[in-house]
């Protein structure tokens, strides 16, 4: 497989961008080697500058649920572009997308469009603090909610300790208001509430974790978090930036029967264009400016092209489309598990809907600690062998792979065939 042009571009990029990229995971740091520079995409495939063709399971980290360059999405975006790229004023397209969101998630009584998932989650945290008059928030170890300072915090030495910054540049005075607990561990969360309940404004979680690889919620966990929030007067924030409109027409909330106080969106609702949103209970959202005193604003919020892309994509995601996604995803997961067994490589294929991760572990993976115990060296060998055989997976053991309605049975068969060869390579690594 030729990579000369990607290598040359990466050399230039390293002179222009930190680490040669504009988002860290793209640099292949977790797997080694040179990232592929992508020149175009169509359907379920992407093509790099050297002419290599890959079945794409990154899908721009989730947004491309109907595949790349879907004609209906392209048409609606092109129509919007002809009308103007940004107005700095209300536009009809905001209402079209918002009505579609509320039709599928009626508990989102009011919402605010923003320009990224990070902006959505940091805004939701501010709203929760303003609404409750409390300062502390709780997140779960391994859950990623964007790059905002309050959320770049990992677990301390115990569930009752204050948060510690997970990045230089995050002040300790900010991080101390972020408390942490292990995902899937309700007793640990109960202890956090026992210690700090009167000061906790909200609990935020990924209902299905995607940023430690796919971690599946244990039965009763998500509702248990909701019940603890109710008991202690904290808001329940469900971060659906990754899962929203991907796992079902009602997102993870619809799939698991959740009714959060606030929910955040991104990715799929922009179909590849920059977008985010937060919304929820009417009484909470009515505290947001200009209706209320909690300030939030954005120059490009409700961008008409992003609204058009999201509207077109959501219209395409019918119940039949979700059934197709489920069948394809199940076939891929089963094929990967079987291929690993043939090579005598122990793996755990965690999947919910069209999100999945192949964990190189002989034990169940259900929280950050069990994910971190995986064999990342084997994953690296597997990743590069898959890449060599035309399957583009996330370049990290700790990320989710995605499928789209553009994927086909042939794509899945090609990927499983590549996996048989790739697991054989992984088996050579200790």
UniProtKB/Swiss-Prot annotation:
Cofactor: pyridoxal 5'-phosphate
Domain of life from the UniProt record: Bacteria
GO biological process: protoporphyrinogen IX biosynthetic process
Positions of post-translational N6-(pyridoxal phosphate)lysine modification: 267
Enzyme nomenclature, EC number: 5.4.3.8
Disulfide bonds: none
Functional pathway: Porphyrin-containing compound metabolism; protoporphyrin-IX biosynthesis; 5-aminolevulinate from L-glutamyl-tRNA(Glu): step 2/2
Keywords for the protein's UniProt record, in alphabetical order: Cytoplasm, Isomerase, Porphyrin biosynthesis, Pyridoxal phosphate
Catalytic activity annotation: (S)-4-amino-5-oxopentanoate = 5-aminolevulinate
Cellular-component GO terms for this entry: cytoplasm
Molecular functions (GO terms): glutamate-1-semialdehyde 2,1-aminomutase activity; pyridoxal phosphate binding; transaminase activity
Pfam families in alphabetical order: Aminotran_3
Keyword Cytoplasm included in the entry's annotation: yes
Primary location recorded for the protein, binned into one broad class: cytoplasm
Subcellular location: Cytoplasm
HAMAP family: HemL_aminotrans_3
Subunit structure: Homodimer.
Family under the similarity heading: Belongs to the class-III pyridoxal-phosphate-dependent aminotransferase family. HemL subfamily.
Name under which the protein is recorded: Glutamate-1-semialdehyde 2,1-aminomutase
Organism in which the protein naturally occurs: Anaeromyxobacter dehalogenans (strain 2CP-1 / ATCC BAA-258)
């Amino acid at each position: 497989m030729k990579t000369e042009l990607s290598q040359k571009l990466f050399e230039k990029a390293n002179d222009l961008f930190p680490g040669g990229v504009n988002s860290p995971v793209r640099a292949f740091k977790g797997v080694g080697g040179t990232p592929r520079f992508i020149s175009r995409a169509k359907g379920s495939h992407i093509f790099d500058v050297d002419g290599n063709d890959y079945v794409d399971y990154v899908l721009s980290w989730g947004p491309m649920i109907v595949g790349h360059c879907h004609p209906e999405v392209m048409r609606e975006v092109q129509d919007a572009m002809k009308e103007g790229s940004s107005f700095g004023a209300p536009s009809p397209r905001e209402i079209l997308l918002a009505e579609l969101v509320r039709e599928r998630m009626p508990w989102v009584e009011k919402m605010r469009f923003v320009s990224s998932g990070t902006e959505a989650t940091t805004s939701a945290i501010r709203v929760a603090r303003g609404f409750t008059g409390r300062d502390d928030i709780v997140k779960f170890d391994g859950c990623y909610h964007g790059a905002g300072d309050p959320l770049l915090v990992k677990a301390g030495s115990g569930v009752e300790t204050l948060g510690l910054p997970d990045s230089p540049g995050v002040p300790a005075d900010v991080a101390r208001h972020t408390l942490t607990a292990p995902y899937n561990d309700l007793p640990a969360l109960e202890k956090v509430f026992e210690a700090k309940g009167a000061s906790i404004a909200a609990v935020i979680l990924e209902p299905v974790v995607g940023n430690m690889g796919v971690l599946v919620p244990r039965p009763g966990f998500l509702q248990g978090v909701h019940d603890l929030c109710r008991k202690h007067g904290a808001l329940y924030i469900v971060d659906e930036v990754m899962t929203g409109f991907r796992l079902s027409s009602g997102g993870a909330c619809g799939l698991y029967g959740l009714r959060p106080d606030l929910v955040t969106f991104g990715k799929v609702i922009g179909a590849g264009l920059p977008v985010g949103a937060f919304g929820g209970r009417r009484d909470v959202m009515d505290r947001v400016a200009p209706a209320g005193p909690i300030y939030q604003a954005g120059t490009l919020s409700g961008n008409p092209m992003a609204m058009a892309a999201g509207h077109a994509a959501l219209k395409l995601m019918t119940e039949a489309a979700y059934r197709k996604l489920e069948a394809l995803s199940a076939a891929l997961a089963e094929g990967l598990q079987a291929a690993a067994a043939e090579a005598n490589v122990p793996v755990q294929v965690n999947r919910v809907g069209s999100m999945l991760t192949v964990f190189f572990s002989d034990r169940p993976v259900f929280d950050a600690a069990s994910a971190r115990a995986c064999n990342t060296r084997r994953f690296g060998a597997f990743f590069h062998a898959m890449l060599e055989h035309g399957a583009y997976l996330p370049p990290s053991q700790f990320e989710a792979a995605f499928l789209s309605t553009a994927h086909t049975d042939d794509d899945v068969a090609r990927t499983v065939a590549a996996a048989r060869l790739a697991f054989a390579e992984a088996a050579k690594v200790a």
